[in-house]
């Protein structure tokens, strides 16, 4: 199982020295496995880093390996080997749940039909993913080759060029927002939050930000349950603490850091639930668990969540310089730990 956080900094994990944020479940992986002090992502931004992880190639070798728009085509060459295809060839059932942001389909894809190529074309047997990112449209989940829960009588339309007639935007209709943008993020409104890009229709399929952690945990546990009697590979791709940071109500106020801290607490809870489920199924000693982050931390990444104002004495990058988007160390120097209970001796490297 690879658990991949989104914009989590080296100093955001208590196993790496955070005293303000407590992450007991992520810490369990570090304490019961090997905690690496020099773990690096391949890029200080999302899509290139994730491309590198799954393809085994440095992103600078791929011309379009950049932060992708929400309707970008699939970034992978489907005839090339990937991490999931290699494991599938070795007899593993492979699945991805959570954030994707690696493109889907081609330039002229109809979101109301089959969405391909995608994860299933690069080696995953099963997929339940966010179509792009939680701040980009379309705000839907894609299960296999289709949008989950889409009503054919209410088709979805997506554009990154212009708005659809009559549709409100964060720029023109700020009175409709419960979370306001600090820069960009002022286009189509969904769930009281304006996003990047324009979208219309598909109401029955739109996700609820507050439920996202539960949705992805449910699907991850279901994948494990379906495949517990045979070898499996799960890419559990967390969406936290990427913006917009909208925790479930039960996590609101769990930290002193506002929404950014609260969604990290939510992510830590999800990791704990997954670890507990492996314990329950007696799979822990037969499962390698890898935890890391796609890039370093950022406080204000487009929404007014008081991340800067409430940060206090917390140091998301630890003692490192820089963060997300930066070529300084904290852009790519991330938490990285590997646990294989009974086979890997706990320690620090």
Predicted stretch roles:
Residues 1-349:
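Formylglycine-dependent sulfatase
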């Amino acid at each position: 199982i690879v658990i991949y956080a989104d914009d989590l900094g080296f100093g955001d994990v208590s196993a790496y020295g955070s005293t303000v944020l407590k992450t007991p479940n992520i810490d369990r992986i570090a304490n019961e496995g090997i905690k690496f002090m020099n773990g690096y992502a391949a890029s200080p931004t999302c899509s290139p880093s994730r491309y590198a992880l799954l393809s085994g190639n440095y992103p600078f070798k791929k011309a379009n390996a950049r932060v992708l728009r929400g309707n970008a085509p699939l970034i992978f060459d489907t005839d090339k080997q990937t991490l999931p295809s290699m494991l599938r060839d070795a007899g593993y059932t492979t699945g991805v749940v959570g954030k994707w942001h690696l493109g889907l389909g081609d330039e002229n894809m109809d979101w109301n039909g089959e969405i391909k190529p995608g994860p299933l074309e690069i080696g995953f047997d099963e997929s339940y993913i966010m179509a792009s990112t939680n701040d980009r449209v379309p705000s839907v989940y894609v299960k296999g080759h289709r949008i989950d829960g889409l009503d054919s009588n209410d088709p979805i339309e997506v554009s990154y060029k212009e708005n659809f007639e009559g549709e409100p935007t964060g720029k023109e209709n700020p009175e409709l927002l419960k979370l306001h943008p600090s820069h960009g993020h002022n286009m189509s409104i969904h769930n009281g939050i304006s996003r990047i890009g324009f979208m219309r229709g598909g109401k029955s399929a739109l996700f609820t930000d507050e439920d996202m952690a539960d949705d992805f945990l449910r699907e991850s546990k279901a994948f494990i349950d379906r495949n517990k009697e045979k070898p499996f590979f799960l890419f559990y791709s967390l969406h936290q603490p990427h913006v917009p940071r909208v925790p479930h109500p039960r996590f609101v106020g769990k930290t002193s850091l506002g929404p950014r801290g609260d969604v990290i607490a939510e992510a830590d809870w999800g990791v704990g639930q997954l670890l507990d489920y492996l314990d329950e199924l007696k799979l822990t000693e037969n499962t390698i668990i890898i935890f890391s982050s796609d890039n370093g931390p950022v406080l204000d990444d487009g929404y007014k969540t008081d991340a800067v104002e409430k940060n206090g004495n917390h140091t998301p990058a630890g003692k490192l310089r820089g963060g997300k988007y930066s070529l300084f160390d904290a852009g790519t120097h991330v938490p990285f730990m590997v646990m294989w209970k009974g086979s890997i001796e706990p320690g620090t490297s």
